[in-house]
């Protein structure tokens, strides 16, 4: 088999082991063993629940949500959902929508499924991963091979068809994982699906908090870490909470780059005008925390090149 050429637009992230917190709190052996047993049960049960509910969409969504929440409990991640949208804003995404979020870890899929079961666009090799691959196949993940640009239009068409038919599809336009403290620009390609289907876009702020309520990078899946090592490390962590916040939906408009900028402004807390002028792909707010408020630009400066 020919190895695909890595193109100039291949998504990349500078995040690595150095982004992980030093000596985070962990659970003991007994709790870890219980987590593993419960997680294996949840991993085995969730695909079954999805299949059982196939003829009945509402039942399928409810069972999928229950399975995902059980899995989150097994992993040891609590869940908080924030939603200040008006009834009118909620109604705009009730019958099909494209959901947009930043990408931190494989746990993002579990967290967002626990809130609202959806179809996910994810890296193609996820289907072949141990354990998670089975879950991905059951949830009918739309695979995308980031090394093969010619496949992108087909994926966009599939997403547009799903939301046009009333489904909810989640995309991670950063196109790769970041640590959550630093993050990348939202790439506009997949957002074309919202424009083609004339569907509203739902931005979602997703972050992970430690037991003190501060944002943590403990769950990030970055650098050279394998999926097995990441699962083992995250299962040992204690005091984690995922926070999911729904912001006001964005109209699709006619320009996917403008839509990407609007969504980026919506899902980032660090600066109202974050996406309003050209910048490099990575921003780390901790680099600039020592700046005086009076001197700080409403658009955070760039910390490093991607």
Regions found by a protein language model. Name each.
Residues 107-158, 167:
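Membrane-embedded segments
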Residues 18-81, 134-139:
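A transmembrane-helix-recognition feature enriched in membrane-embedded lipid enzymes
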Residues 132-133, 179-262, 273-286:
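A cross-family acyltransferase "interaction/gating" segment
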Residues 93-104, 108-115:
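Glycine-rich active-site/cofactor-binding loop and its immediate structural neighborhood
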């Amino acid at each position: 088999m020919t190895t695909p050429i890595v193109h100039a637009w291949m998504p990349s992230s500078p995040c690595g082991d150095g982004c992980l917190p030093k000596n985070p709190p962990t659970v003991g052996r007994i709790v870890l063993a219980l987590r593993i047993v419960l997680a294996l049960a949840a991993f085995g049960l969730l695909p079954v629940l999805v299949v059982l509910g196939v003829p009945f969409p509402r039942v399928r969504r409810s069972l999928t949500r229950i399975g995902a929440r059980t899995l989150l409990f097994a992993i040891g991640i609590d869940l908080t959902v924030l939603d200040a949208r008006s009834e009118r804003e909620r109604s705009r995404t009730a019958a099909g929508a494209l959901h947009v979020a930043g990408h931190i870890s494989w746990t993002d899929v579990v967290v967002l499924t626990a809130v609202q079961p959806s179809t996910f666009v994810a890296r193609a090799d996820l289907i072949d991963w141990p354990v998670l691959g089975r879950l991905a196949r059951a949830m009918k993940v739309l695979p995308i091979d980031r090394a093969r640009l010619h496949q992108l239009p087909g994926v966009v068409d599939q997403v547009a068809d799903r939301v046009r038919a009333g489904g909810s599809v989640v995309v991670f336009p950063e196109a790769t994982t970041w640590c959550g403290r630093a993050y990348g620009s939202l790439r506009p390609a997949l957002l074309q699906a919202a424009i083609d289907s004339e569907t509203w876009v739902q931005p979602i702020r997703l972050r992970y908090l430690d037991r003190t309520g501060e944002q943590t990078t403990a769950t990030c899946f970055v650098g050279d870490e394998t999926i097995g090592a990441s699962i083992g490390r995250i299962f040992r962590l204690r005091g984690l909470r995922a926070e999911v916040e729904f912001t006001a939906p964005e109209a699709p408009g006619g320009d996917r780059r403008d839509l990407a900028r609007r969504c980026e402004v919506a899902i980032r807390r660090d600066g109202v005008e974050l996406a309003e002028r050209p910048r490099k792909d990575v921003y780390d707010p901790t680099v600039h925390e020592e700046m005086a408020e009076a001197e700080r630009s409403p658009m955070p400066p760039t910390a490093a090149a991607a």
